[in-house]
Amino acid sequence: MHWPFEPEQVRALLPPELEVDAFDGRAWVSLVPFTMRVATGRGWSVPWASTFPETNVRTYVVDRLGRRGVWFFSLDAARLGAVLVARNGYRLPYLWSAMTLSGPDGLPAEPGSGPGPGPRPGPRPGPGPGEIRYGSRRRWPGPRGASCRLRVRIGAAYRDDELGPLDHFLTARWRLYSATGPAHRAIRASHDPWPLYRAQVAELDDGLLRAAGLTPPPGDPLAHYSPGVGVRIGRPEKYL
């Protein structure tokens, strides 16, 4: 899901080394839930962090050398081990959350990933055909309790000639940026083009953008669905 923002709203939340990468004069912020399946370079699974729900809140940036990429405001994941490795090794703002994701590319709720006592953030039982349900509630480090619940209906696949410049702008990104204190890092990513499907948001109660300091504009967001592709992530490098 993607929302347009005034560039000044987003720029105020970026490090000075990065600038908003605008499309038709607007900054864009995306909320992206998905299932993460982790493997080593040789294709081995990682037992303590192999398959789990994850979601990120991100925007689109360009550095001082003109290289385009993604800046993450937050990355919520249901595996504490994966969160610790990503925070320490990649300096990315990973957070441990109770998460559920079900539907065409989702996972049933699993022990250790559910929200525990109290109201469940979702999903509710029995998603319909072509429907995804997702829920999360942040555990650590905070702001604790930041949550999201959504339901998305999936439509027909896009043909290549039906995709426009904005679709490519939002999905074709090859560099991730992070900054922790004085350390600024860029991480290269490579993947095939995402196969995209039409999607419609049927229900959305989101607090993850608000936790990042952003209030979505009124109206329905632009939405895509993808069954996914393999993504290779490089080592962190200093970018400036």
Kindly give the residue locations of the regions a language model identified.
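Short N-terminal helix-initiation segments at or just after the protein's N-terminus
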Residues: 1-8, 43, 167-177
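N-terminal domain-onset segments
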Residues: 1-41, 194-204, 217, 225-228, ...
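Long, hydrophobic/aromatic-enriched structural stretches that serve as scaffold segments
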Residues: 24-27, 32-65
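Short, surface-exposed linear patches
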Residues: 21-25, 43, 52, 81-83, ...
